Amino acid sequence: YKYDDATDPLRNKDVFTVFQNQKSVAELPVKDFYFAWWGAPADGVQADRFATVSTTTFEVQAGQYVLELDSDDGARLYLDDQLLINHWDVHEASTDEATVSLKGPHRLRIEHFEAGGFSTLGFRMRPLR
C-alpha cells in the first residue's frame, strides 16, 4: 500500500484498518518470508512511504515456539488478533521476538511501514528447545 501525510502510519496508527478495506497495489504470495528493499518492493509501489500487510494461517503441534520479526521501519505482529510484537516507529534493522505456547490452527498478521531508505521485513518461527 502507498501512504501519504493523511494516512501516515506513525501519525494515524489505525491506518491499516483503512488499508485493508482497499485494493492492494501489489500482492506477493511467498513461501519464505524475508524481504530487503533498497527501492520499490513491487511494480506500482513507490520506493519510500509504503506499507505492507501480510497474513497467513498455519497449524502446529503443541509446544513452545519463538516468533522472530525482523523489521526496518515499523512492524507489528498479531497472532490470532492478539498483538505480540509492537515495534511501531522508525528504526534501523532490528529483530524482536515473542515466545508463545501453541497448538493447532492459528492466524498470523504482520503490519509494516517503510518511511525512507532501506527497508527489511522477515519472519521466522522455531520450536523452543
Where are these regions (language model features)?
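Extracellular/secretory pathway-exposed regions associated with glycan biology
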Residues: Y1-V66, D70-R129
